[in-house]
């Protein structure tokens, strides 16, 4: 069999697997007035995503098995970056933003080169992997209060919050992800996972703004050991913690 025929066979098999694997829950998808269509998203997924996330959307793609952290398993309906409470489905805008932004400290790149329509279509197809979208609705997003001034006093208070909430046990005293518990952590699939290193770059796992980091504190990162602190951390202390963590970053761009 020639290389061309083998390539065509792989494409045909992948398409057949995709067709058989996706039940099509028909979840509605709309972002900023752009309605996603799973049929179009299927073709985009085959082109851009199947190599890592797999034909079944379970994160077991041909390339995905070599990646750390592993690609997202869409069949569980569990997502790290959300504006909704822990344990709940994300908003369409949450997943749409992740597609466009990518995920720091992972192999997930930014797909901002795709049009708004293409990203909405891709989102519609991704939602078809999990039955949760057919029976659950995302809860209302977290209300984010206005950010108070980033002052030296706020940073000092944030450092005390970092100590009191024992963030250092995972993220380390200097925020570099080398805490005493770091080597023992596992994700929801019992695979080793490393804490985020706050000292690298100017972005966080789910974005680059202070609001993005605030949301992580209050919603947690589902599928990882990072919990939600919504019930234990008052908003003003969460903002202090944001300001403190900013001081750990190298060459922060104001």
Q: Residues of each region from the PLM?
A:
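Bacterial N-terminal signal peptides that target proteins for export
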Residues: 2-12
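Bacterial N-terminal signal peptides
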Residues: 10-20
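Accessory recognition modules or surfaces
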Residues: 24-40, 50-76
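Electrostatic cytochrome c docking/interface patches
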Residues: 25-44, 133-163, 202, 252-254
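Sequence/structural segment immediately N-terminal to covalent heme-attachment motifs in c-type
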Residues: 35-54, 150-176, 183-188
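Short, non-ligating residues that shape and space the ligands of small metal-coordination modules
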Residues: 58-59, 176-177, 235
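Short, solvent-exposed loop/turn and secondary-structure capping segments
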Residues: 61-64, 108-111, 134-138, 172, ...
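Extracytoplasmic electron-transfer domains, predominantly the class I c-type cytochrome c fold
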Residues: 65-112, 119-126, 184-233, 238-246
């Amino acid at each position: 069999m020639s290389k061309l025929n083998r390539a065509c066979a792989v494409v045909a098999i992948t398409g057949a697997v995709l067709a058989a694997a996706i039940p099509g829950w028909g979840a509605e998808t709309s972002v900023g007035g752009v309605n996603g269509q799973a049929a179009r998203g299927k073709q985009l997924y085959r082109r851009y995503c199947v190599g890592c996330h797999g034909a079944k959307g379970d994160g077991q793609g041909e390339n995905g098995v070599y990646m750390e952290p592993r690609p997202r398993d869409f069949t569980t309906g569990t997502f790290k970056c959300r504006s909704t409470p822990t344990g709940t489905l994300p908003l369409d805008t949450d997943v749409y933003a992740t597609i466009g932004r990518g995920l720091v400290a992972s192999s997930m790149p930014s797909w901002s080169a795709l049009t708004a329509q293409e990203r909405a279509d891709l989102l519609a197809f991704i939602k078809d992997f999990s039955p949760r979208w057919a029976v659950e609705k995302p809860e209302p997003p977290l209300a984010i209060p206005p950010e108070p001034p980033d002052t030296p006093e706020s940073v000092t208070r944030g450092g005390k919050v970092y100590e009191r909430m024992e963030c250092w046990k995972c993220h380390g005293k200097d925020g570099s992800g080398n805490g005493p518990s770091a080597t023992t952590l596992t994700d929801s699939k019992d695979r080793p996972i490393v804490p985020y290193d706050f000292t690298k770059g100017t972005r966080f796992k789910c974005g680059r703004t202070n609001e993005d980091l605030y949301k992580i504190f209050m919603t947690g990162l589902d599928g990882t050991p990072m919990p939600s602190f919504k019930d234990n951390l008052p908003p003003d202390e969460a903002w202090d913690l944001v300001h403190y963590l900013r001081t750990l970053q190298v060459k922060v761009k104001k």
